[in-house]
Amino acid sequence: MDVKNCWYREVCPKCPNQCGPTCLRYIEMLNLVQQSNIPESKWVPLKLRPGVDRDAFLELQDIKENIKSWVAKGNNLYIYSDNFGNGKTSWAIKLMLAYFNEVWAGNGFRRRGMFFSVPEFLDRSRELMNNRDEEFVKLRQDIIDCDLVIWDDITSTELTNFNHSILLNFIDARILANKANIFTGNVDYEGMAKNLGGRLSSRVWNNSKVVEFKDQDKRGVYNG
């Protein structure tokens, strides 16, 4: 990521003429994002239009404005919609970036937030049985202690027993440790129970604030 795309370019008085890659704020924030596993294409948050989801956006904005205490309390959030492409993942990442903005100062090299596409996470976990990926092993080791984890698209498919065991172990451990999680999916509780099973769906749904989006697919029509 080039410094010209810095997260603070619209509010920092040094941007663009006096800013450079040695800026401490930029370096700390970049390190947090690089360690988070957020896809680089999503490092800069979209400006989202609420449409019919105004009330849902206001709920999420309230969490965003209090994100540091929200994470410290070990809260959980499930953002879902029957429709695709209406901002669920974008909002989850927006909240994580807001948290990074609150904790960057003096953070050093500590990993504070992690993003996982659940289907990819499960595929890579299964591949570990035959091919040890040291980078992914390290990511998995940090899951339990990390402040905030995004579990994106958690309800995408019915879990096998193997995949169910993996997810349940990690999510159960985080909830018991009072660690914050953000889940996204495309099903309500009934669909979640079908895909995740009763035990895991109970952990996710009953321990989370549930926010539903109803707008249609808006990919390509966001303002920014």
Regions found by a protein language model. Give the residues of each.
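Active-site signature of alpha/beta-hydrolase-fold catalytic machinery across serine-
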Residues: 94, 98
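Loop/turn-to-beta-strand initiation segments
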Residues: 112, 145-148, 177-183
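Walker A/P-loop nucleotide-binding motif
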Residues: 71-93
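Conserved catalytic network of the ASCE P-loop NTPase/AAA+ motor domain
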Residues: 70-71, 106-108, 141-144, 172-177, ...
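Short glycine-rich substrate-engagement loop in P-loop NTPases that contacts/grips substrate
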Residues: 54-61, 80-82, 86, 99-145, ...
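A short, basic N-terminal segment
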Residues: 1-66, 210-211, 215, 219-224
